[in-house]
Design a protein with these regions (language model features):
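Glycine-rich loop(s) and the adjacent beta-strand/alpha-helix scaffold that form part
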Residues: 1-44, 189-206
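A generic structural signal for short coil/turn motifs at secondary-structure boundaries
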Residues: 1-2, 115-117, 183-184
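Short glycine-/small-residue-rich flexible loop motifs, especially phosphate/cofactor-binding loops
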Residues: 15, 128-129, 318
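An anion/pyrophosphate-binding glycine-rich loop and adjacent beta-alpha core
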Residues: 23-140, 206, 210-213, 247
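Proline- and acidic/polar-enriched loop/turn elements at helix boundaries
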Residues: 30-31, 144, 333
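Glycine- and aromatic-enriched mobile tails/lids
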Residues: 55, 62-71, 75-80, 90, ...
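FAD/FMN-dependent oxidoreductases across multiple families
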Residues: 129-172
């Protein structure tokens, strides 16, 4: 996604690699977006601020027209609505032209009791320090409003596993954010840390047990040579799109068409565009010809996998014709009890994505 709290090196490779290996994936449409992230400077765009509850009990959100717009989205919980609701509200206000001139919303903590600000600053010291650096000490001390935008944050969907982290491929284990189904359609704050502790331990124990009884398979030399040849393709291409440009096109497409607010038409357009990007992937050109420490070659390899992961997300989002948790369809805005099911993706004999609902 073009706006994300994650580091640039986190490109979703695990989902695509597991799919290629024959593993099933579950609920890939469940992508979490946080309501508050830094809009500027460009080097910090999308970086985590968090949620409204971190800025006092009387925090308020305003659009560029001075409206407290959460009255429209959740008049009872207002700024303390769940993160998906507030992120969607922030996105909608900006998308429909009611944001500030910088296409942001305003977080206003000024009606809080400022004697409490120290307690809150301790709870999220890094974010408060970054707010002070970006917007000034007054914003960090609840004396002035500051700007924010929503940002992609986490994947609830992922590789389908059992309680011992086994996938549907023999001896392939998975845990953490690469796995899916642990958090359902939404994730509570802090549970990702619990997840990696619990399932990381289970995966490690199961891997050790498998290793004791499973002989190591030898990789055929020709497979290794073929993999090396694939990495050379991008150095030999002369006229292709630079991988960085291709990546930007993909990320913008995902934000615009498979982002916080989705629709059937947008998802169809996204899948067609992703098919074009997939055909283009082998033709991207690393202009840097160095064979070592070549960032462009790495980006070219990552791009192929990013496109595949993006197709998995868009395919699953198109299949789920309802809104649930982090997945919101403006053409199906209500939660449908009949959809209390999982979308399962797997690789078909023609390498295409097979969809099942269970």
């Amino acid at each position: 996604y073009s706006t994300s709290t994650n580091a640039q090196c986190l490109t979703g490779d695990g989902y695509a690699l597991a799919f290629d290996a024959g593993a099933e994936l579950v609920d890939m449409e469940m992508v979490q977006f946080l309501p508050l992230a830094f809009p500027r400077p460009s080097t910090m765009r999308g970086q985590l601020i968090g949620m409204c509850s971190l800025f006092g009990p009387n925090v308020k959100l305003y659009n560029g027209l001075g409206e407290r717009y959460m009255l429209r989205y959740d008049p009872e919980k207002l700024e303390y609505a769940t993160r998906d609701v507030v992120a969607r509200a922030n996105y909608t206000e900006i998308q429909e032209g009611r944001g500030t001139r910088r296409k942001t919303i305003l977080v206003d903590p000024t009606e809080n009791d400022r004697s409490c600000v120290g307690t809150y600053r301790v709870s999220l010291a890094v974010a408060y320090d970054m707010i002070a650096e970006t917007f000034g000490e007054k914003a960090a001390n609840w004396e002035a409003a500051f700007e924010a935008i929503p940002s992609q944050h986490f994947m609830m969907g992922g590789v389908r596993i059992d309680e011992d982290c086994r996938t549907t491929v023999a001896n392939l284990l998975c845990c953490g954010e690469a796995s899916g189904g642990v958090h359902g359609a939404n994730r509570l704050a802090g549970n990702a840390l619990t997840e990696i502790l619990v399932f990381g331990k289970r995966a490690g124990r199961k891997a050790a047990a498998i290793a004791r009884t499973t002989p190591v398979k030898q990789i055929h030399p020709e497979m290794a040579r073929a993999a090396v040849r694939q990495t050379q393709v991008y150095l030999n291409n002369q006229d292709g799109v630079p991988p960085g440009h291709a990546r930007q096109r993909l990320q913008t497409l995902m934000w615009d068409k498979v982002g916080i607010v989705r629709s059937g038409d947008d998802l169809e357009q996204a899948l067609k565009a992703l098919s074009r990007l997939e055909r283009m992937a082998d033709g991207v050109a690393a202009r840097c010809r160095m064979r070592h420490w070549n960032r462009e070659r790495l980006e070219a390899l990552e791009f192929r996998l990013m496109v595949k992961t993006a197709k998995l997300i868009a395919t699953s989002a198109r299949e789920r014709t309802e809104s649930r948790g982090s997945h919101y369809r403006r053409d199906f805005p209500e939660t449908d009890p009949a959809w209390r099911r999982n979308v399962i993706l797997s690789k078909g004999s023609d390498n295409e994505i097979k969809v099942a609902v269970a």
